Structures are given as structure tokens and as C-alpha cells.
Amino acid sequence: VRRILPVLIVLLLLPFAAPTRAAAAGTVWHVIRPQESLAYIAGMYDLDPHDLASWNQIPYEAPIQPDGVLRLNPPPAPLPVFSSRIETVSPGMVNWNPAKGCPIIPANLRRVWVTYIDFTGAARDGSVIVRHDVAPRVQRAFETLYRWRFRIMAMAPMRLNMPGETDMSIVTAGYNCRAVAGTKVWSEHAAGTAVDINPLQNPMKRGTFLSPAAGGLYLDRNRRLIGMIHPEGAARAFLWNGFHWGGTWTSLKDYMHFSLTNR
């Protein structure tokens, strides 16, 4: 996380920089807030709304969605059409150890590949592993996030999508054969029925415990920062596909966590 914090600080400040009509270099963007329209945002930055729609490859007349991110300058390359595929996994892919007694076997897991937009605005191919019957729901949710231009910090394979990063707590991911922190109860991740989105920007807080530990910057959920999830924004992509969101819990808050069982 130390390596990425300076980058995050720059990313957080960029939306408040004064962009030109066609910035020649750098990435400048705006995180969409509720009730904002394309024309309203264009007016904020003295831009033509048609240019704004073109740069972000979105229909001019289509409503924009909270938590999405709009470029305020021409992209270096157009975004590709969203694509996704589902693959089987081998025991080695999930570090399978029969002795642990994980609640699901590798044969019932699937790797879901999706196109996503990273924090620099580049399109990448990333994957999450979930239970076989959950995979289509995950595909639909990520397609919606992509269409809304929501950005994801990092997904596997990290050696390609964020080379050199060693802190896996920041990765958007699904299956993980582990217990709920501080208990002996299997996590829904161990069953392949949960996905965590942008953990650093959407931390879990239980009392004074915070995970990831560096997520304190994002505890004020009234802020609108790149990668943050809000109920009227990105959360809906998963809620509409049958998931429950840990951001609505009362005993603790787990803003990254989407599960089918509400656990």
C-alpha cells in the first residue's frame, strides 16, 4: 500500500484541477454524483457535453450513473467493448488443500474474466473466482459497472494488472478459503458466493478494527472519490443481480462486500 498511496493522493486531487477543453496530457476526470447530468458536468468544466460523451464513449442522451467516472479530456485510445468469459479452475489455481475442509471443491468453482477500467482509465482484463452458478450474475454486474464507467483499482492477474504490488488486500476478488475474521465460521468467500470490490476504497469496519488498515481515508462515505461504492451508485450493479451489500449492515460495515446470503 505504501507504494500506491502517493499515486492515490495524486488521483484524488486531479478531479479538482482546472482542465482545458482538450488536455494534451495527463488524466483528468470527474466522479459522478447523484442528480448530475452530462450537461451539468460539462458546464462545471467549460466543456462541450457532446465532447464529454464522445471521450467517454457513452450515448449523449443516456443518463449517467453515480460513482461512474468521466474523463474530461480525449482518451489516448478508445475503450474496447466489454467482454467476458467463464473458465473452469484447477486445484492449483485456488491453492486447494483438502485438509482445510473448504466448503466447496474446485470442480464447482469458475474463473470469470471481465473487462474493467482501472484507476488510470485504461481497460484491462481481470478475473474473479466464484461458485459455478454465481458466475453469470457476476458477469452481468461487471458489465453494468463497465457501462457506467466505474473504475476498479486492480484485479487478478496482478503480475499483469499491477506489476510489483504485493499487498493483495487491495484486490477486487471472490473465492478465498478462509474463515470470517476473528471467528471459526466460514466466510462466504470460502463458498464462492461473495465478491469484494475495491477493498481499499470500501473498507470493512467493526468497532475499532479496520480492513484494509490503510482504508481510513475512505471512512467518510459522504465523500465521492474514485472507486468508492454508494447505495445509489455502483452498489446497484450487484444488488440488481441478487447480491446483498455489507454497506447496509448495522453490526458492522463492510462496504466492499457483496454476497448472495447477506453474510
Describe these PLM feature segments:
Residues 29, 37-41, 123-132, 183, ...:
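Second-shell loop/turn segments in exported
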